[in-house]
């Protein structure tokens, strides 16, 4: 299998540089006239799968599935399988983070051979970047991707992410460590794009420098959260092709009509299409 970095680059080139979120929170289920049950969750996801077929990347927010226990995880597994059957890359927004054998278990679940394993997964480096090593290694071995939280758009994040770490912010330290990992893997895989990226919010002021990352930058917060799609170019010194804007509510609030959700997604894709420029 080709590495995630190369698959992502190909998907963006052919389907556009946009990641669409599936965030089935109870308020949205009610707005779509669906019950806040596992059955309502499944119906919501069926609409999203139909609307998002043909797009590059879809990001299910795992927490909203966990809320329904085993039934929710079953819906998540089925949704991921249906998306991938349509050629869509699946990014599991799980934000996992731990140490040792526990992190190894997360690695097996989200980046190994489990039914939950996605094309890529989000992780938290709060326990130290080295704590992510088990998952990074499993993901690399299985040609999957990882997105490491670096500079998030929530105001509370700045307390830690902008703290000084030997002359650079914690966010910059994380970006630099990811860049080093991509360089190490690149010595083995050659010129293939890096498969480990970072998360930098669209509304972050003074974002970290990602020009040396060697991997993709997931940019959530576009749309309702205040990020302007036309203002993403050059974020953190990124090349246009590095950026992967992510949008959820701006598109999902157009539901429950499949055609309306798809039309909203296409409008957002049009607004970020300039990021595909070579």
UniProtKB/Swiss-Prot annotation:
Pfam families, per this entry? OMPdecase
Output the SMART domains linked to this UniProt entry: OMPdecase (SM00934)
Q: Which SUPFAM superfamilies match?
A: Ribulose-phoshate binding barrel
Catalytic activity field: orotidine 5'-phosphate + H(+) = UMP + CO2
Q: Supply the alphabetized keyword list.
A: Decarboxylase, Lyase, Pyrimidine biosynthesis
**Can you tell me which residues form the catalytic site?**
95
Associated pathway: Pyrimidine metabolism; UMP biosynthesis via de novo pathway; UMP from orotate: step 2/2
Provide one Gene Ontology biological process annotation.
'de novo' pyrimidine nucleobase biosynthetic process
- Enzyme Commission number: 4.1.1.23
> What is a single molecular function from GO for this protein?
orotidine-5'-phosphate decarboxylase activity
Q: Give the domain of life.
A: Bacteria
PANTHER family, per database record = OROTIDINE 5'-PHOSPHATE DECARBOXYLASE
Q: Which family does it belong to?
A: Belongs to the OMP decarboxylase family. Type 2 subfamily.
Name of this protein: Orotidine 5'-phosphate decarboxylase
Gene label? pyrF
């Amino acid at each position: 299998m080709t590495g995630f970095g190369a698959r992502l680059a190909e998907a963006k080139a052919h389907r556009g540089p946009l990641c669409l979120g599936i965030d089935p929170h109870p308020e949205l289920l009610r707005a779509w006239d669906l019950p806040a049950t596992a059955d309502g969750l499944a119906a919501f996801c069926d609409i999203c799968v139909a609307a998002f077929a043909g797009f590059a990347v879809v990001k299910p927010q795992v927490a909203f599935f966990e809320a329904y226990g085993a039934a929710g995880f079953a819906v998540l597994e089925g949704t991921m399988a249906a998306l991938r059957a349509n050629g869509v890359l699946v990014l599991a927004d799980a934000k996992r983070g731990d140490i040792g054998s526990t992190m190894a278990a997360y690695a097996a679940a989200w980046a190994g051979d489990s039914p939950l394993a996605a094309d890529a997964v989000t992780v938290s480096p709060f326990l130290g970047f080295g704590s992510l090593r088990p998952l990074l290694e499993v993901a690399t071995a299985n040609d999957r991707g990882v997105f490491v939280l670096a500079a998030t758009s929530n105001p509370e994040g700045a307390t830690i992410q902008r703290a000084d770490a030997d002359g650079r912010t914690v966010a910059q330290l994380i970006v630099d460590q990811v860049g080093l990992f991509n360089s190490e893997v690149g010595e083995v895989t050659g010129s293939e794009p890096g498969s480990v990226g970072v998360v930098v919010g669209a509304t972050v002021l003074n974002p970290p420098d990602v020009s040396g990352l060697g991997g993709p930058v997931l940019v959530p917060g576009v749309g309702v959260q205040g990020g302007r799609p036309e203002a993403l170019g050059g974020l953190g010194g990124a090349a246009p092709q590095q950026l992967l804007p992510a949008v959820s509510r701006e598109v999902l609030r157009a539901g429950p009509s499949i055609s309306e959700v798809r039309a909203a997604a296409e409008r957002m894709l049009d607004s970020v299409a300039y990021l595909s420029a070579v």
